[in-house]
């Protein structure tokens, strides 16, 4: 019985907590945001507008990378970029 109470309390404490993730945020067409010119300020602003902790321009891919994005924000995992498709 004590274990049940302990598990119930643990579930209540973790309910509603929001976890965060890192990754390349996506536009509507499954394309990541580019940062030509390695514009870290642009990427940081973009990421913070998406409720992330911070962001920067990843030079190897020339794409914006965000730290601490909310779970409901889509990130690049797989699939092709489909420019112009809504």
From Swiss-Prot:
Q: Which GO terms describe its cellular component?
A: extracellular region
Looking up CDD domains in the UniProt record yields: neurotoxins_LC_scorpion (cd23106)
Cysteine pairs forming cystine bridges in this chain are 31-81, 35-57, 43-64, 47-66
Record domain LCN-type CS-alpha/beta: where:
21-82
* Keywords attached to this entry: Amidation, Disulfide bond, Ion channel impairing toxin, Neurotoxin, Secreted, Signal, Toxin, Voltage-gated sodium channel impairing toxin
On tissue specificity, the annotation reads: Expressed by the venom gland.
Q: Where are the Proline amide residues found in this chain?
A: 83
Picking any one GO biological process from the record gives:
defense response
Domain of life, source organism? Eukaryota
Can you tell me which family this protein belongs to?
Belongs to the long (4 C-C) scorpion toxin superfamily. Sodium channel inhibitor family. Alpha subfamily.
Write out the domain note: Has the structural arrangement of an alpha-helix connected to antiparallel beta-sheets by disulfide bonds (CS-alpha/beta).
Q: What is the name of the protein in this document?
A: Toxin Tpa4
Q: Which organism is it from?
A: Tityus pachyurus
């Amino acid at each position: 019985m004590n274990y049940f109470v302990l598990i119930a309390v643990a579930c209540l404490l973790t309910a509603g907590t929001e976890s965060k993730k890192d990754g390349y945020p996506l536009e509507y067409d499954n394309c990541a945001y580019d940062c030509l010119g390695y514009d870290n300020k642009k990427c940081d602003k973009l990421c913070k507008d998406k409720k992330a902790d911070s962001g920067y321009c990843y030079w190897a891919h020339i794409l914006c990378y965000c730290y601490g994005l909310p779970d409901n924000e889509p990130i690049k995992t797989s699939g092709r970029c489909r420019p112009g498709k809504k």
